[in-house]
Amino acid sequence: KPNGAFLSGNYLEYNVMPYGGLLNYGWLDKNLSLAGRILIKKKNTWNSKIIDFQKTVAVVPSVAIHQNDKANSNLDLNMQTDLQPVFFLSEKTSDWIDFLKKELKLTTETIGDYELFLYDNSKPELFGKKDEFLLSPRIDNLTSVCAALESFLESSSENIQVFCSF
């Protein structure tokens, strides 16, 4: 959301919007990173840059069980009040742009606009007695794209074929 930074106490948070099917509780207490596109102006020239922080920069904290006695029986999460990520301690919302500039090592450049996405930056890993299980964020999307692409590549159709993945 444009100008989405806000303060909750001394926490700088950012209004977010869901994309696609969202399993709300799955975002709680995860190490979240930020990636997307940012528009940067340097010497009167605007350039678009793809960015990926590749480290934890935010968390959507859950409430402790003693503060919500219905957490195990009725977890009803509101996108606008319960799922806002916390980025850092701050006293002013303008620190958001300063944060982006510092992380991207920008000095004199101006940040114009951006479209950023939070993602779970946990690393995939195998587990089980014989490492028979794979635990990975985004595995449902990755496997479906892989299966579709393999089918596309192995197809022997003489017709025009198109494969799109977003």
Question: Residue spans of the language-model regions?
Answer:
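N-terminal hydrophobic/helix-forming segments and targeting peptides
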Residues: 1-166
